[in-house]
Amino acid sequence: MIIIKTLSHRIFFPKFSQTFSSQFHQTLRFSISDRRKFSAMAGAGVDDFVKGNVFPNGVALITLDRTKALNAMNLDMDIKYKSFLDEWESDPRVKCVIVEGSTSRAFCAGMDIKGVAAEIQKDKNTPLVQKVFTAEYTLICAIAAYKKPYISLMDGITMGFGLGLSGHGRYRVITERTVLAMPENGIGLFPDVGFSYIAAHSPGGGSVGAYLGLTGKRISAPSDALFVGLGTHYVPSEKLASLKEAILSANLSEDPNQDIQATLSKYSSNPESEAHLKSLLPHIESAFSSNKSIKETIEELKKYQQSTESSVVEWANEALKGLEKGAPFSLYLTQKYFSNVACAKSKPENELATLNGVMKTEYRIALRSALRGDFAEGVRAVLIDKDQNPKWNPTSIEEVDENEVEALFKPLSPEVEELKV
């Protein structure tokens, strides 16, 4: 029997008590009242938060309009979003899809983390956890495989699930106001939403993506966003409305991709500054390569603190501060997981070489990680009490039990369905 010490019960593992199995299986029957309960957290109907319109020229537009929460996504928003995509993909009148945020402050700040954590604290067996991750991860796979042009206008904060909604799409438009980050280690989870797959295809054999995922580094320079591959086109914010209008009024041909590429080329430009991360690439690759353990990464960064180059010292100091904010267990898990995905990239027979395979594995990890005490503690310290002083368990990387980390990757128990994508 595999038991994760910090979990209050034995869920999701191949072997556990039949009594609990029966109880947990019952909780997976997701009722209307469950949906209403989760929706109530948002304070308004999903139709107010996710708006969909199809314009006469065949351009469909999704607008995330939950401004007070920086367009953070909850379960019903996920479901509504995917229903639009599914409907439009089979509608011959729809030629492409644009997604945007309702405010220049944010495209999407991520998942409604406080709502999920609150439900877990009320009931560790809540079916909402499984439903939220199922909705998110199937939506990500749908975006990545979307048959029609998918254009993300990533103006403002684009973090966590915001990168999931945009980073797997074909066209990723950034502005000088775009702020990109995966800060999940800082709340006791791990960088999910398929970011490990994006990271594996980043410069330096995936080391740049691993660096961003482990440290939670915020990318605000357009040149860096383009260098990493998180953005495909830089459009100054003063031109964004004109770009949108040009697409909404365009006479799209039988090959809308060609028309969209031409329009994006017209409004996009090269950032004024060079990519800072590009100049740091040798150091990032050395410290965050897939063959380095998290302990070795930290030791490497400490060596760089003694560099004669001030820019390298500054980078190393910042990276270490970023790592210090993460839960030790999360850091250990993230390094191992990202390394596995990066190493699988060149091995087609490996399930982790595909996004769908990555998301199936990620689903197992997410369901289990969300029930660890670190998640509730991280949300408390960062988002609720805001004392920025989480009490992690374990308290150091040296105390992390590798067997506990390995257990997160194992197939789910027969009573809990694997992700279907």
Swiss-Prot record:
It holds the Pfam family ECH_2. Its EC number is 3.1.2.-. Disulfide bonds: none annotated. The modification N-acetylalanine is found at A42. Coiled coil: none annotated. One of its GO terms (molecular function) is 3-hydroxyisobutyryl-CoA hydrolase activity. Its main location: mitochondrion. Residues 1-41 form a transit peptide. This is 3-hydroxyisobutyryl-CoA hydrolase-like protein 3, mitochondrial. It comes from Arabidopsis thaliana.
